[in-house]
């Protein structure tokens, strides 16, 4: 998925909404826009794997939004989303070789920093302030996020 997203020409700078352009980050909207059916299909397959691996305790696989974002050095993006109270976010890295201890790029939520490891996902209320933590390398951090219906 990371390789396909790197090759995509569908990146936008819409997020976080309401922030000046200089504070926005690159993102591909897969659902509902669905401009890239290959990436969207892979993303839905991944979400079902997350659901089967234990996500069913926290969410229904009813997707309201799915996107891939890229973050790098100098991207400081604390923000809140504006989803309904029945929505949670599922977030994970697409970089298979990302090493948080060496390069940073974790996840800050509710005042606590989390180490995002490749193949691991975090489920959270995105209506609370959250952001990527400082990245210490020129390498880009790719992440996929889903807005889904909370159980």
Regions inferred by a protein language model and the residue ranges of each:
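Catalytic core of non-heme Fe(II) oxygenases with the double-stranded beta-helix
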Residues: 52-151
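Non-heme Fe(II)/2-oxoglutarate
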Residues: 1-58
């Amino acid at each position: 998925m990371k390789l396909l997203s790197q090759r995509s020409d569908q990146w936008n700078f819409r997020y976080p909404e309401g922030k000046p352009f200089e504070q926005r980050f690159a993102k591909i909207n897969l659902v509902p826009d669905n401009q890239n059916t290959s990436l969207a299909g892979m993303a839905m397959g991944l979400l079902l794997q997350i659901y089967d691996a234990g996500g069913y305790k926290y969410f229904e696989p009813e997707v309201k939004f799915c996107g891939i974002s890229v973050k790098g050095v100098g991207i400081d993006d604390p923000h809140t989303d504006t989803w309904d109270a029945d929505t949670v976010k599922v977030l994970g890295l697409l970089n298979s070789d990302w090493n948080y201890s060496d390069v940073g790029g974790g996840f800050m939520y509710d005042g606590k920093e989390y180490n995002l490891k490749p193949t691991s996902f975090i489920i959270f209320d995105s209506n609370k302030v959250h952001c990527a933590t400082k990245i210490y390398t020129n390498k880009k951090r790719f992440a996929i996020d889903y807005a889904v219906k909370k159980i």
